[in-house]
Regions:
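Secreted/processed peptides and extracellular or luminal domains of membrane proteins
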Residues: 136-138, 154-157
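A penicillin-recognizing enzyme superfamily signal
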Residues: 1-139, 145-146
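Short, low-complexity, Pro/Ser/Thr/Gly-rich segments in the mature regions of secreted, periplasmic
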Residues: 156-169
Length: 169
């Protein structure tokens, strides 16, 4: 007989977990799960859609403040189901949430994460007043000071590698 252990063990740092969850909320508000956001306006949920090669499988993982739910739609003969994550499994999750009701995620930004500006062209951290910069939450430790708008980036790929490399460290 299995008994759930209530004590959770943290395996990633709080900042990386929060940034991942924040990115997953953007899937609902702006990405492949935006139909879910439209169906539940004002609710904050996180999600990830998935589709395997040749439309064989439709996957969706969604969460609110109460539950994390994973849905798979596919065929047992490995033939294409003909559905994407958004057109298949997301629809089942959406129906489930309609029945159960949504309890919005509470996303309190953790210490060590702050809004920062990045160049869309290079990925380098730039001053917040740079035209065309993208503002996103970031784990600032190790990023260094932002560059001025006029500063050239010597190696744009390295700037992105630094940003992503520090994401989960």
């Amino acid at each position: 007989l299995y008994q759930h252990d209530e004590a959770a063990k943290r395996v990633t740092d709080e900042q990386a977990s929060w940034l991942t969850l924040f990115a997953m909320t953007k899937t609902v508000s702006q990405g492949t799960a935006r139909a879910l956001g439209a169906k539940f306006p004002g609710a904050t949920m996180a999600a990830k859609t998935g589709t395997t090669n040749e439309l064989r499988d439709s996957w969706f993982a969604g969460m609110d403040n109460n539950e994390l739910v994973s849905v798979w739609v596919g065929r047992d003969d490995n033939q294409p189901a003909g559905l994407t994550g958004a057109s298949g499994a997301l629809q089942l999750f959406s129906g489930y949430m309609s029945q159960r009701g949504v309890n919005s995620l509470g996303l309190k930004m953790p210490e060590g994460v702050s809004w920062a500006s990045f160049s869309r062209a290079s990925g380098a951290r730039v001053a917040s007043d740079c035209p065309g910069s993208l503002q996103v939450p970031a784990k600032l430790a190790g990023l260094g000071e932002p560059m001025s708008c006029a500063s050239p980036v010597s190696n744009p790929v390295n700037a992105l590698d630094q940003w992503f490399g520090g994401f989960f460290n």
